[in-house]
Amino acid sequence: GAARVKELVEEEKHSLSGTFRLGVLPTVAPYLLPRFFPRLRKEHPETDLRVVELKTKEICQALREGILDAAILVRLPETEGYVQTPLYYEQFVVYVSRGEALFDRTSIRTSDLEGEPLWLLDEGHCFRDQLVKFCHLPAAREAQKTYTLGSIETFMRMVEGGQGVTFIPELALEQLTVEQKELVRPFALPIPTRQVVLLTTGDFVRHSLRDLL
């Protein structure tokens, strides 16, 4: 992710002045932005980067209406029709509290999640939608074993407090402490993954800014 961003930065370094409005998914922003935003501010102070966190549907609408210049989100059917610059692939991992039976497993199968108290994002988040589909979680929702709140970070705090199971993206692992990493369990094969891309419209002309990101 960060290496790809750096590679794009080296391609063009002109026409970087002015305001650039970037939409980012809430499940991507906390883990990707800290990797390049400080360097961008230091090396290109003339670039006024405005970042807003939005869900996929909101981002696509804002791009169509010209409210955003570009967006960082996950490649989905909804993103087809836009100019897509691949940034990176990443896996999902399971975050398990010490009080759950799954904590003793070295890897997690999707069938292991049935009946578990899962912390999931609200509907409309592609992060949730991908995992619900991959892990066959509707049955868990119907059994009222799945609860919803607002952010991955909130769910992580709940798990660390001894409550339930949640999912986090691979890029988040770099920010975890040794103690937090003890709660991480990989999925058994097949492993759910996502592709993070930079999205722009076909008439986007500030290519230097796009390449910078």
Residue ranges and their predicted role:
Residues 117-138, 206-208:
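Secondary-structure junction motif
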Residues 13, 79-118, 202, 210:
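Flexible hinge/capping segments at coil-to-helix
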Residues 17-80, 141, 148-151:
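Central regulatory/effector-binding core of bacterial HTH transcription factors
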Residues 83-93, 166, 170-173, 178-193:
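Short beta-strand->loop
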Residues 32, 183-213:
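A late-sequence structural motif
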Residues 22, 62-64, 113, 157-163, ...:
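Hydrophobic residues within well-ordered alpha-helices
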Residues 47, 63-72, 92, 159-165, ...:
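Alpha-to-beta junction loops
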Residues 1-13, 213:
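Alpha-helical linker/hinge and terminal dimerization helices associated
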